[in-house]
Amino acid sequence: MKTNSEEQMIKLFGIPLSDKPRWQQFLICSSGFFFGYLVNGICEEYVYNRLKFSYGWYFTFAQGLVYIALIYMYGFRTKQMVNPWKTYVKLSGVLMGSHGLTKGSLAYLNYPAQIMFKSTKVLPVMVMGAFIPGLRRKYPVHEYISAMLLVIGLILFTLADAHTSPNFSIIGVMMISGALIMDAFLGNLQEAIFTMNPETTQMEMLFCSTVVGLPFLLAPMILTGELFTAWNSCAQHPYVYGVLVFEAMATFIGQVSVLSLIALFGAATTAMITTARKAVTLLLSYLIFTKPLTEQHGTGLLLIFMGIILKMVPDPNPNPKSSGSGQTPGKLERVKFEKEDDEESRPLV
């Protein structure tokens, strides 16, 4: 076993993070995440709403190809892998299942209903963390309350601007619930991989997940005919590919930043950050376009800020397996499997 000084350090595009103070780690990773997904939102608004191109599977496939090219340019090669391919087969299966169920649920749920469900993502992430072998995270009560405040606040803020009420369908509810469970499993599985094998890099996880995941996209594209329709439409408007490449480059920064957050702070904290990002994006749209803010908007914002502040309260009884703090500061520590019970020592995949 390697000593702490020999352990792999987490880096974000060459910036060493493991030896920095926690607040600097958080600021750097969050900034990369917010930048990437703010650009992503602008590009999606342009492509989906302005150009009326709703080819989600095809665009995701194109984005994956850009990811692979960028990671290859960054210098990653498969010989640098420290995890077996089967790890990423399961990871990609969950990822594509979540994407498919979320996309499919739109046929049965209207936008406000889907927002309500997707906003609760942080809660199943926290619950699922207790059942992942090698992770077994337990969170203090105040973190559950913090997550609830954040979720309720975001729902109130979002629905304040909804022109229609949430419309529920049992099939849609089952699909979006399945997507949430897969999302929860995905984040915790990524955290467990980083925890059980600290030499895992963000580039390895993103590259392997993308390479394994792309074939999963071919079946729905071919079966729905989207592959040929999207190809013909984009051939008539080739500038769309320029937008897609630019968006993929930005979201690449966001994705690597998210994986860094998971490795350093854990899946639950990362889920709270991604949830808070939605609130920040919505608030910016109101400030930039000077939309009127109602009392319900104010109530939602108040609950969101209360949840964020409560999240910052330190745990009075710290436990290495509790909270969503991810890896310890400084050099990453390996999980000592010999000190775990049989269930904890069971292979992750």
Swiss-Prot record:
It is a multi-pass membrane protein. Signal peptide: none annotated. The chain crosses the membrane at residues 23-43, 56-76, 115-135, 140-160, 167-187, 205-225, 248-268, 293-313. Its main location: membrane. It holds the Pfam family UAA. Residues 340-349 have a biased composition (Acidic residues). Residues 316-349 are annotated as: Disordered. GO terms for molecular function: antiporter activity. GO terms for cellular component: membrane. The keyword Transport applies. It is found in: Membrane. Keywords: Antiport, Membrane, Sugar transport, Transmembrane, Transmembrane helix, Transport. Belongs to the nucleotide-sugar transporter family. UDP-galactose:UMP antiporter (TC 2.A.7.11) subfamily. Sugar transporter involved in the transport of nucleotide-sugars from cytoplasm into the Golgi and/or the endoplasmic reticulum. PANTHER family: ADENOSINE 3'-PHOSPHO 5'-PHOSPHOSULFATE TRANSPORTER 2, SOLUTE CARRIER FAMILY 35 MEMBER B. This is UDP-galactose/UDP-glucose transporter 4. It comes from Arabidopsis thaliana (Mouse-ear cress). The gene is UTR4.
